[in-house]
Amino acid sequence: MLPLDGVTVVEVSSFVAAPLCGMTLSQLGAQVIRVDPIGGASDVQRWPLAASGTSIYWTGLNKGKRSATIDLRSPEGHDLVQRLITEGDGIVVTNAALPWLDHALLSAKRSDVIHVQLLGRSDGSTGVDYTVNAATGFPLVTGPVQHAGPVNHVLPAWDVCCGLYAALAVVAAIRRRDHSGAGARISLALEDVALATAGNLGLLTEPQVNGTQRQRLGNAIYGQYGQDFTSRDAVRFMVVTLTGRHFRDLVEVTGTGAAVAALAQALKVDFTAEGDRYRYRDVLSGLFATWFTDHDADEITAALSNTTVLFERYRTFAQVAQDPKVTDNKLFSVLDQPGVGDYLAAGLPAAFDGEHPRSAPAPALGQDTADILNQYLGLTASDIARLTSANTIAC
């Protein structure tokens, strides 16, 4: 039994954050009904696509859900979605700002409704991961030190964080409702997620209390010693020493003990202190780099594996997909996804009692419409035929 078995959630969404929230809840055992307009929302054909034209992206974020397609512009379509929410478990997650889907209207129909509204910005204005990220400061400290302009990271970090915060909010609201009977109106802004993260990590506190701001470091790690190195056969490694022992092992394995000691004496610093290791990271990296360029990747891996040094080689996505960390990992299982094919798909990263909840295939768009309307609203075959002929639903 999974934690959310027996819970039904209606999701009216698109793109990353809200679908990720719904998929996370599904992996925890909830029955998640994704409602889309007829023909699909604006993310239904988002790249990458499989050879069949099916969106790998869309199926990846909607695994394990059920799909209903309804005319979201018609009053009858509005009524169907409202009923699915209020006559079901009274839980909806959406990133769509639709008047007919707002909390006040739904709570008038069901007082304990749990309504989670994802926003771009807290004032209701539009914001997406890429624009929110630009306003947070992160692109100006990302990338090579010599680079003058901003560098966007590829990971839609704020969408991912927002989706997981939203899933947490749903679980917390269910817990509260179970104890008090109260519903919840939850708003979660993408920009607030990014700002809170920057604040919690000290990036906004630093200029307020110290009058300083973070600078671009390339692949170095702020406040610690960490750097990337290249092997003789052109394989790049990320090497991190968080503790004194890590650093001592790196010095020993690279045979730089005498040089590091002489450097410490010349600079009158103590490399057992992480602050000094960080301040003089460039000259230390110069000492260590020779050892890396004198050895092949396999030699480096073998040598560092016998130490406490934290390291990993950089890999492409294609290399990762073939690595035992994927192919021999219980997190992944073979998924037969219609339109895409068989592939190793991740389940829920959290293992419950040693087992990762597995993913089920994403639905075809609208494949469950008739079954959902019959199961939750009691609509008959003739009702569904009438709604289909009126283009209120698509099955």
Predicted regions mapped to residue ranges:
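A short glycine-threonine-serine/GTX helix/turn-capping micro-motif
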Residues: 151-161, 185, 216-217, 224-226, ...
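Oxidoreductase and adenylate-handling cofactor-binding alpha/beta cores
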Residues: 163-183, 200-207, 251-263
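Short, well-structured beta-strand/strand-turn elements
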Residues: 32, 305-319, 379-385
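Terminal low-complexity tails and localization/encapsulation signals of metabolic enzymes
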Residues: 1-8, 230-232, 319-395
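Aromatic-enriched alpha-helical interface/lid elements that frame and gate functional surfaces
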Residues: 225-307, 311
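Conserved Rossmann-fold dehydrogenase catalytic segment
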Residues: 147-155, 178-194, 216-219, 269-270
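N-terminal helix-loop segment corresponding to the beta1-alpha1 unit
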Residues: 1-179, 298, 364, 370-395
